[in-house]
Amino acid sequence: MSLYKNKIVITGGSGRFGSKLKKIKNKYKLLFPNKHKLNMLNLENIKKYLKLQKPYYLIHLAGLSRPMEIHEKHIDRSIDLNIIGTANITKVCAELGIKLIYFSTSYVYPGTKCNYK
């Protein structure tokens, strides 16, 4: 599949970091699909969207911003989006030869509880 070097798909465009990227002027065509256009839990949907858009890069920002809070009450949402969704994006990018850039922020884990620093 021939990819467009000036096109970048960005997941999580409505989040804190993604919303900042929307304001940056640059030479790239940035696409910010919402969860209805790019359903990270549906491999076929991801493939269809990425084959249609043919981005050279995918910047993966989507995820629950406070998973520890949500994890306590809704473990399935935390696992679906942060683990399965990310795995699906990774798998399809690898299959289609799309370069994946993955970010995670400090809002994911507060650094005050458990045995990490």
Task: List each model region and its residues.
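N-terminal Rossmann NAD(P)H-binding glycine-rich loop of SDR-like oxidoreductase domains
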Residues: 2-26
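Rossmann-fold scaffold of SDR-type NAD(P)-dependent oxidoreductases
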Residues: 11, 56-61, 102-103
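Glycine/Thr-rich phosphate-binding loops of Rossmann-like dinucleotide-binding domains
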Residues: 18, 68-69, 110-111
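Short, well-ordered alpha-helices that flank and scaffold nucleotide-derived cofactor binding pockets
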Residues: 19, 23-27, 48-51, 91-95
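Adenosine-cofactor binding site in Rossmann-like domains, unifying the SAM/SAH pocket
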Residues: 26-49
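NAD(P)H-binding glycine-rich loop region in Rossmannoid oxidoreductase-like domains
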Residues: 43-81
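Conserved internal alpha-helix in NAD(P)-dependent oxidoreductase domains
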Residues: 76, 80-87, 95
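Conserved Rossmann-fold NAD(P)-dependent oxidoreductase catalytic core, especially the SDR/UDP-sugar
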Residues: 87-117
